[in-house]
Curated annotation (Swiss-Prot):
Its EC number is 1.3.1.98. Belongs to the MurB family. Pfam families: FAD_binding_4, MurB_C. Keywords: Cell cycle, Cell division, Cell shape, Cell wall biogenesis/degradation, Cytoplasm, FAD, Flavoprotein, NADP, Oxidoreductase, Peptidoglycan synthesis. It catalyses: UDP-N-acetyl-alpha-D-muramate + NADP(+) = UDP-N-acetyl-3-O-(1-carboxyvinyl)-alpha-D-glucosamine + NADPH + H(+). Cell wall formation. This is UDP-N-acetylenolpyruvoylglucosamine reductase. The active site is at 167, 244 (proton donor), 348. It is an enzyme of class 1 (oxidoreductase). Gene3D superfamilies: 3.30.465.10, UDP-N-acetylenolpyruvoylglucosamine reductase, C-terminal domain, Uridine Diphospho-n-acetylenolpyruvylglucosamine Reductase, domain 2. GO terms for cellular component: cytosol. InterPro entries: FAD-bd_PCMH, FAD-bd_PCMH-like_sf, FAD-bd_PCMH_sub1, FAD-bd_PCMH_sub2, MurB, MurB_C, MurB_C_sf, Oxid_FAD_bind_N. Its cofactor is FAD. The gene is murB.
Length: 356
């Protein structure tokens, strides 16, 4: 098995932000075996390694990456019937995520329909426990096959071993594991899982908890995402982003009480901030709400970067931007929210060669 490498490949061409300097070496792999063999060879050489999927959740330094970048293009898929209603689907890391979701909807497999339209590839989804519109990966993942670089062997990790939490897992922020494939447990049904997200329920004209045809959910989610610039469109600069740039803060009960008091002081006692129970007494609030009320509306920004005109959480490359430009805006927003509300926002995209 021989993998060919290109040199000084601009990573801007491989990220949805359209930002990032060159990779010293770059290759694509088409199978899990080739992925593991190439990672092993790079590790033995001592070269820094970056494993790349769809580049949709990535912020790369203007200086690029002084090592080897492996783009994962493996795309095999197989089914195992558990019983008459339950199917396990094993999907290679390199398959386009939305192609997988579309296939599930077409074949009457319920469980990922609300995750339609999310850019990127399957291998990235467990890393940050991708979620939207009331569904997330942890609800359907059974196991993840990884190459353990430290032990030089493949391992199969159960969902429990993946350590899933809000937009994170044991994989995020660590380069020990390379995701090879993911197994999802889905339900044979023409109907969706119960609709949990209020905005999606309103769009569908149903109540939360109702089930509707899979295709209806997919169409509604795609429509909602397009309205927010969250479906890639080369003609729309608002889609040239890394999706949501900041995660929604999760606060302890004491932190939320202090935050509520701060909101009353700043915005008035009649203003109630968004609050969603998150277990163990914790409360999740809205990063978008914080950003807008700290003085950063949709469309904020001048020059080549700005906040999307459709979605407050998306920071966009309007054309001709650099990663330094993007980070300057992100830091301005983060500092503004901290100054007004005392909450420090956390970035959702993975940072390569830069920090916020």
């Amino acid at each position: 098995m021989t993998t060919s490498f290109a040199r000084n490949v601009p990573l801007a061409d491989y990220t949805t932000l359209g930002l990032g300097g060159p990779a010293a070496r770059f290759c694509s792999v088409a199978s899990t075996d080739e992925l593991i063999a190439t990672v092993r060879d790079v590790d033995r050489s001592g070269d820094p390694l970056l494993v790349l999927g769809g580049g949709s959740n990535l912020v790369v330094a203007d200086e690029g990456f002084a090592g080897t970048v492996i783009q994962v293009d493996s795309s095999d898929l197989s089914y195992t019937e558990v019983d008459d209603t339950v199917v396990r689907v094993r999907v290679d890391a390199g398959m386009e995520w939305d192609s997988f979701v579309a296939r599930c909807v077409d074949e009457g497999l319920s469980g990922v329909e609300a995750l339609s339209g999310i850019p990127g590839r399957v291998g990235a989804t467990p890393i940050q426990n991708v979620g939207a519109y009331g569904q997330d990966i942890s609800q359907t993942v059974v196991e993840v096959t990884v190459y353990d670089r430290a032990a030089d062997r493949t391992r199969v990790l159960s969902a429990a071993e993946c350590g899933f939490a809000y937009r994170t897992s044991i994989f995020k922020g660590r380069d020990r594991y390379v995701v090879c494939d993911v197994v999802f447990e889905l339900t044979r049904s023409k109907l969706s899982r119960p609709i949990r997200y209020a905005e999606l329920a309103r769009s569908l004209g149903v109540s939360q908890g109702d089930q509707v045809p899979l295709a209806d959910v997919r169409d509604a989610v795609l429509s909602l995402r397009r309205s927010k610039g969250m479906v890639l469109d080369p003609a729309d600069p608002d889609t040239r982003s890394a999706g949501s740039f900041f995660t929604n803060p999760i606060l302890s009960a004491d932190e939320f009480a202090r935050f509520t008091q701060r909101v009353a002081e700043v915005l008035g006692p009649e203003v109630t901030p968004p609050a969603y129970p998150d277990g163990d007494g914790r409360v999740k609030t809205s990063a978008a709400w914080l950003i807008e009320r700290a003085g950063f509306p949709k469309g904020y920004g001048t020059g080549p970067v700005g906040i999307s005109t459709k979605h407050t959480l998306a920071l966009t490359n309007r054309g001709g931007a650099t990663t330094a430009d993007l980070l300057a805006l992100a830091r301005e927003v983060r500092a503004g929210v901290a100054r007004v509300f005392g909450i420090t926002l956390v970035n959702e995209p993975v940072m390569i060669g830069v920090t916020l």
